[in-house]
Amino acid sequence: MSPADDASLLLGLVQRHLRSLRLSLDPQFPDEDWGFTAQQAVEKLLKVLIVLRDQRPPRSHELSELAALAEVELPTQLLGLQTYAVEARYEEGPFPLPATREKLLEEIEQLLDCCIKAIG
């Protein structure tokens, strides 16, 4: 597969994550589950940018590491989703989100737009 094909495959998964995030904006939906899905979307978007640089992304959930490899500066709020990769899944909370769901979703969608433009 070409880098663009690999990136498109990842973008399909991100679109599924974004649908889940949009459907779970209700504050009754657990922050830990919403944050995990948001973290996964950001992780995959960064991996899209890494793949488009014709590099193989590492098997890592560390957003700051992936952002460095993708040569992208992530907003602080998106970096704040790192907790949801592992800690919020296996430790007792609460784990409050680093910003409102709407703000986080907006920032994730901006990163998605960046990826779509990079694919061309």
Cite the ranges covered by each PLM segment.
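Terminal alpha-helical segments
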Residues: 1-120
